[in-house]
Swiss-Prot record:
GO cellular component: chloroplast
Subunit structure, as described in the record: Heterohexadecamer of 8 large chains and 8 small chains; disulfide-linked. The disulfide link is formed within the large subunit homodimers.
Organism of this sequence: Zea mays
GO biological process: photorespiration; reductive pentose-phosphate cycle
InterPro entries named among the record's database cross-references: RuBisCO (IPR033966), RuBisCo_large_chain_AS (IPR020878), RuBisCO_lsu_C (IPR000685), RuBisCO_lsu_C_sf (IPR036376), RuBisCO_lsu_fd_N (IPR017443), RuBisCO_lsu_N_sf (IPR036422), RuBisCO_lsuI (IPR020888)
Keywords: Acetylation, Calvin cycle, Carbon dioxide fixation, Chloroplast, Disulfide bond, Lyase, Magnesium, Metal-binding, Methylation, Monooxygenase, Oxidoreductase, Photorespiration, Photosynthesis, Plastid
Sequence positions bearing N6,N6,N6-trimethyllysine: K14
Gene3D superfamilies recorded: Ribulose bisphosphate carboxylase, large subunit, C-terminal domain, RuBisCO large subunit, N-terminal domain
Lineage: Eukaryota, Viridiplantae, Streptophyta, Embryophyta, Tracheophyta
Name used for this protein in its record: Ribulose bisphosphate carboxylase large chain
Enzyme class at the top of the EC tree: lyase
GO molecular function: magnesium ion binding; monooxygenase activity; ribulose-bisphosphate carboxylase activity
Active site residues of this protein: K175, H294
């Protein structure tokens, strides 16, 4: 038995497996401006050196396979292979390493998130030599990002379409999420929009079920929008979920929404898929529709710290695939979202240029060049007492979405919407006057209660509601 066979057998490999590190571990490599760079959190099997594990990730996510093949001689492996160019230990965990991999641009089809992910987060995640693998971040070079359309419209165009400036936008997910008839659903939309919200929203799992077919819902929601607009003088919208079982059906629903003259549609981009999402995004730009994105299924992919893919990667992928809004967590509500990490990927969604900042989980400097930004949506377990914190954390270019925090108001839907609008206007005015929302938030809300009975009632019913005491899973 050769020494190579003995070594491989001792760590669970079979004879004939080649040493990946001989070809794919290249610490001397200087990355190119056109490379796609990836940071993987790697947990090797016992006995597998980190250099071999990192090289295996680079190989299996690019050109490599488990043995030498004769067709390697028919191409330039050095031109096309991924390279593990740097490895660093994870502080506090001696069994984990951050392995940096560079991929040449020619490995990927232009304008295809689907193809990019098929390589980078494909079969390699089931590789036996690894106990766990997580993609922490990607650097998308301008040479690749410029092959994508990106968001259909972007932040500034949306504000111009809505004629709303200088404050966050307000939304509400209609509840109960399933079971309402189309007419009652439309009634709830109208009441919320008339009460002061900018948007109402289909829940992510509202598609076209027996209790409410999509066409009926679209018609009643459009009626609600036009009635609320006529009464308030403000432009209103409802996120009509176009997600469907086929791309053809999805586009048919988007076409009907456009024919109704509504401003925005919605897609569940992970369950619907990146190919479908990019298709819908292109349609929305060509036809003047805004596109709201829900991230249903993201926690299956991103919640475990050791395995899967961080949401900042999914956020970058969405910006390339296309969407004008995306749910991003709240920091203060019922859903997972640590402040600095959340603000890190919020910047990756909105800003043109984001510096590397490991304290916020950003492994690479990212330059989006001229790609439009995406508005983050804070949604999940929030109410009027959270308004100062949300305004301070997310700033103006955001959507603050209160579902139960609107529809759970003791006086009804319209008063619930009015309470949220008054709270937001009070916080924006206080901020513009130079007051500290983080420190004075409760006092600002209490003062506004004196001239809004709707807000006072909301503050009373939700004064004890908190979602504290749970340990965050997503930490640096």
């Amino acid at each position: 038995m050769s020494p190579q066979t003995e070594t491989k057998a001792s760590v669970g490999f079979k004879a004939g497996v080649k040493d990946y590190k001989l070809t794919y571990y290249t610490p001397e490599y200087e990355t190119k401006d056109t490379d796609i760079l990836a940071a993987f959190r790697v947990t090797p099997q016992l006995g597998v050196p980190p250099e071999e594990a990192g090289a295996a990730v680079a190989a299996e996510s690019s050109t490599g396979t488990w043995t030498t093949v004769w067709t390697d001689g028919l191409t330039s492996l050095d031109r096309y292979k991924g390279r593990c160019y740097h490895i660093e230990p994870v502080p506090g965990d001696p069994d984990q390493y951050i392995c940096y991999v560079a991929y040449p641009l020619d490995l990927f089809e232009e304008g295809s998130v689907t193809n990019m992910f098929t390589s980078i987060v494909g079969n390699v995640f089931g590789f036996k030599a690894l106990r766990a693998l997580r993609l922490e971040d990607l650097r998308i070079p301008p040479a690749y990002s410029k092959t994508f359309q990106g968001p259909p419209h972007g932040i500034q165009v949306e504000r111009d379409k809505l004629n709303k400036y200088g404050r966050p936008l307000l939304g509400c997910t209609i509840k109960p999420k399933l079971g309402l008839s189309a007419k009652n659903y439309g009634r709830a939309c109208y009441e919320c929009l008339r009460g002061g919200l900018d948007f109402t929203k289909d829940d992510e799992n509202v598609n076209s079920q027996p209790f409410m077919r999509w066409r009926d819902r679209f018609v009643f929601c459009a009626e609600a929008i036009y009635k609320a607009q006529a009464e308030t003088g403000e432009i209103k919208g409802h996120y009509l979920n176009a997600t469907a079982g086929t791309c053809e059906e999805m586009i048919k629903r988007a076409v009907f929404a456009r024919e109704l003259g509504v401003p925005i549609v919605m897609h569940d981009y992970l369950t619907g898929g990146f190919t479908a999402n990019t298709t819908l995004s292109h349609y929305c730009r060509d036809n003047g529709l805004l596109l709201h994105i829900h991230r249903a299924m993201h926690a299956v992919i991103d919640r475990q710290k050791n395995h899967g893919m961080h949401f900042r990667v999914l956020a970058k992928a969405l910006r390339m695939s296309g969407g004008d809004h995306i749910h991003s967590g709240t920091v203060v509500g019922k859903l997972e979202g640590e402040r600095e990490i959340t603000l890190g990927f919020v910047d990756l969604l909105r800003d043109d240029f984001i510096e590397k900042d490991r304290s916020r989980g950003i492994f690479f400097t990212q330059d989006w060049v001229s790609m439009p930004g995406v508005i983050p949506v804070a949604s999940g377990g929030i109410h009027v007492w959270h308004m100062p914190a949300l305004t301070e954390i997310f700033g103006d270019d955001s959507v603050l979405q209160f579902g139960g925090g609107t529809l759970g108001h003791p006086w009804g839907n319209a008063p619930g919407a009015a309470a949220n609008r008054v709270a937001l206007e009070a916080c924006v005015q206080a901020r513009n006057e130079g007051r500290d929302l983080a420190r004075e938030g409760n006092e600002i809300i209490k003062a506004a209660c004196k001239w809004s009975a709707e807000l006072a009632a909301a503050c009373e019913i939700w004064k004890e509601i908190k979602f504290d005491g749970f340990k965050a899973m997503d930490t640096i």
